[in-house]
Amino acid sequence: MITLTPGHLTLPQLRQIAREPVQLTLDPASFAKIDAGAKAVSDIAAKGEPAYGINTGFGRLASTHIPHDQLELLQKNLVLSHAVGVGEPMARSSVRLLIALKLSSLGRGHSGIRREVMDALIKLFNADVLPLIPVKGSVGASGDLAPLAHMSAVLLGVGEVFIRGERASAVDGLRVAGLAPLTLQAKEGLALLNGTQASTALALDNLFAIEDLYRTALVAGALSVDAAAGSVKPFDARIHELRGHRGQIDAAAAYRELLEGSAINLSHRDCGKVQDPYSLRCQPQVMGACLDQMRHAADVLLVEANAVSDNPLIFPDTGEVLSGGNFHAEPVAFAADNLALAAAEIGALAERRIALLIDATLSGLPPFLVKDGGVNSGFMIAHVTAAALASENKTLAHPASVDSLPTSANQEDHVSMATFAARKLADIADNTKHILAIELLAAAQGVDLRENETSPKLAEVMKTIRSKVAHYELDHYFAPDIAVIAKLVVERAFAKHCPFAFASEQ
C-alpha cells in the first residue's frame, strides 16, 4: 500500500505504481484542504456570480453564463463531449500513473472537488478497474482533455474499462469496485479534465523504461569493449574529472567496475594499438551526456507529477478563483523531447558497436562473427536490423514541442504537443531494446571467440545470455534469439548487473 501525500510524490513511488500491483490510499492530512476547496466552489456557485469553470462555458464559450440549475448538466456534458480520443488503449502502467497523478493534483485542495469523487478513483484503482483511455487526441493544452475525459466518463458509468485486464463496460467496472455512477457538481468535471496528467504519466512510464535500457546499455557497451579487445584506459577517472560533467564521471565509473578483472583486457594491455574507435572510447562522454539529459528530465517530470495543473485554481483562504495556464504542458514536452534524444542516442551508439564487432578489420574477429563465413552469414543482417531501428529512432527523436496548432477557435492558440512527445518515447524505447538485444548477442559471440576470459561481472552477463541462446555456430532461424534476449532486457536481467542506479530505483 502506498500512501499518496499530495504534492510529495517521489520517483521510487511512481516507479512502483507503474511497475508493481500496489494499492493506494490518500494521506488523511490532505482532507481538510480538499474539503475547504470543495466548500469554496459550492459557496461561489450558490452566489451565482460568474466564475470561469464553475458557472460558465469553456474555452471560447467562457463568457456564456450557465444558470444554477444546469451546473450539474454542464459538468456531465463537458466530460461526455470531451471524450473523443482515438487509437489504441493507453498502457496499463501509464493509466495507473495517470490516476495517481490526478489524485495528487486534486488532493492539494485547489481544484474544488469533493473527496467522494477522489475516493471513487481510488476504489477503481485498488479494484484493478482501469479506464480504457485511447492514447491519441491530446495536444497538451488546455491540459490532456480527451484522455482525462475518458478517465472521468467511467465515474459517470460511461465508456469502457479493463477489469483485471479484461475489457468491459464502465457500468460493470463500477459494480466490481462497489460504486454507483456519480453526479458531478460544479467545477468537478473541469477539475478532472484539466491537467497534464496524461502526458506526464506517459513520460514517466517511458522514463522508467529508458532508465532500464540505459543500465542495460552500459553492460552491453562494456561487454563489447572486451569482445573488440578494446582498452579500459579511456575510462580512467582522471580523464573524466578534468571535464567535470557528472553523468560522464558516473558512466566512466560504471565501465571501470564492469570491466575490472578482465583477462581479455590484461592480455592486450601492451599491444601496439594506440586508440579505439569512438564507439568504444567515447562511451562515457556520449552515455554521460545521455545520463545528464535523463536526470534533468526526471527532475522536471517529478515537479510536474506534484503540480496543480488545473484551471481555474481555487484559493479557499481568500475565496478567490484565479485563471491561469498551469495546464500548458510545455515543461513535459521539453522533458520528453530530451528523453527522446537520449534514448535514440543510446541505440545509435549501440548500433555503431555492432557494426564494429562484425567488421573483421576493426575487431580482429571473424567476419560477421561466424567462423565459416561465406556459407554462413552470421550477424550480417542482424546488424541491418539494428541499423534500420537506429535510423527510425532518429526520425522519432525529432522534437514534438516545436510544433503547435491553434485550437478552440484560436482561444487556445499555442499548445505543447506534450502527449505525442511522451507517447513516441515508447516506440523509441522498443527499437532501442531490440538494438541492445542484438548487441548483447554480438558481444557475447565476440567474447566467446577470444582466448581469454572476460571480467567476473561480465561473466555473469555471459551466463545469462548463454542460458537462453547458444553460441552461434551455423546459420539458423535467428529472430527467436533476438526476441528472447529482448525479453530479458525488459525483465531487467542485464540492468541488474550494472553498478549504477537511478533515483527512481533508490
From Swiss-Prot:
Contains an active site 4-methylidene-imidazol-5-one (MIO), which is formed autocatalytically by cyclization and dehydration of residues Ala-Ser-Gly. GO terms for molecular function: histidine ammonia-lyase activity. InterPro entries: Aromatic_Lyase, Fumarase/histidase_N, HutH, L-Aspartase-like, Phe/His_NH3-lyase_AS. There is a cross-link at A141-G143 (5-imidazolinone (Ala-Gly)). Keywords: Cytoplasm, Histidine metabolism, Lyase. The modification 2,3-didehydroalanine (Ser) is found at S142. Pathway: Amino-acid degradation; L-histidine degradation into L-glutamate; N-formimidoyl-L-glutamate from L-histidine: step 1/3. It catalyses: L-histidine = trans-urocanate + NH4(+). Its main location: cytoplasm. One of its GO terms (cellular component) is cytoplasm. It comes from the Bacteria. It is an enzyme of class 4 (lyase). It is found in: Cytoplasm. Its EC number is 4.3.1.3. GO terms for biological process: L-histidine catabolic process to glutamate and formamide; L-histidine catabolic process to glutamate and formate. It holds the Pfam family Lyase_aromatic. The keyword Nuclease does not apply. The keyword Chloroplast does not apply. PANTHER family: HISTIDINE AMMONIA-LYASE. Belongs to the PAL/histidase family. This is Histidine ammonia-lyase. The gene is hutH.
